[in-house]
């Protein structure tokens, strides 16, 4: 057997920005680095279904800055069920690590209903892990989070810079697989989100390109905000 792969934790910085700053950064970054190949029209829509227990432990850990902490979500793109994945995002010592595995539509429907996927012993380890926590902690789906993402990538440093706009949420988790879902906006008008992710270092020219007059790092969480707005 080969050696296990090392767990790759990444830096993840978040900033609240204005819609005008989104336009400015999009123009600036377009002249420096490439759009993600999956952004066929310059952007794509991300929809995530998050899990929590009946004590809202994931929400409270997020708001309290508990370290380490992790949360599970199911993710799809552009309202299409052709590509669905289960993800677990772990935060530890200020760094983040994400693991994922594909899901079928049938598996997703079981999880949406808070049910255990059949024959889970034959499934990927991540799905087995979620199943165990559904049984022991009673994890269940609690909120849908959706937004549009403009993603830029740069190979050196494995950099990913994203401009996330039009954040909306829904507590009707049964609608997750529909092409369009009923939702409500959760951000103040004109407020958007910048995320910067990288491995060991952020190239200086990219750091300089991100400088805005009042850019301030935040511990902002899409999940926590959407939970608060959909209660």
Predicted regions and their residues:
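Phosphate-end processing signature that detects enzymes handling 5′-triphosphorylated RNA
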Residues: 1-231
């Amino acid at each position: 057997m080969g050696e296990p792969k090392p767990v790759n934790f990444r830096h993840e910085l978040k900033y609240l920005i204005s819609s005008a700053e989104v336009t400015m950064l999009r123009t600036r970054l377009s002249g420096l680095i490439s759009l993600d190949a999956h952004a066929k029209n310059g952007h794509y829509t991300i929809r995530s279904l998050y899990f929590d227990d009946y004590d809202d432990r994931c929400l409270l850990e997020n708001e309290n800055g508990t370290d380490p902490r992790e949360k599970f979500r199911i993710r799809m793109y552009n309202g299409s069920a052709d590509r669905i994945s289960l993800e677990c995002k772990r935060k530890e010592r200020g760094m983040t690590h994400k693991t994922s595995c594909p899901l079928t539509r049938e598996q997703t429907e079981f999880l949406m209903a808070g049910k255990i996927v059949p024959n889970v012993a034959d499934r990927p380890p991540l799905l087995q892990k979620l199943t165990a926590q559904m049984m022991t902690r009673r994890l269940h789906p609690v909120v849908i989070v959706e937004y549009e993402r403009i993603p830029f990538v740069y190979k050196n440093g494995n950099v990913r810079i994203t401009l996330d706009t039009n954040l909306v949420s829904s507590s009707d988790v049964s609608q997750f697989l529909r092409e369009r879902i009923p939702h409500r906006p959760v951000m103040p008008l004109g407020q958007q989100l910048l995320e910067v992710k990288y491995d060991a270092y952020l190239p200086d020219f990219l750091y300089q390109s991100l400088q805005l007059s009042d850019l301030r790092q935040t511990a902002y969480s899409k999940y926590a905000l959407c939970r608060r707005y959909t209660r």
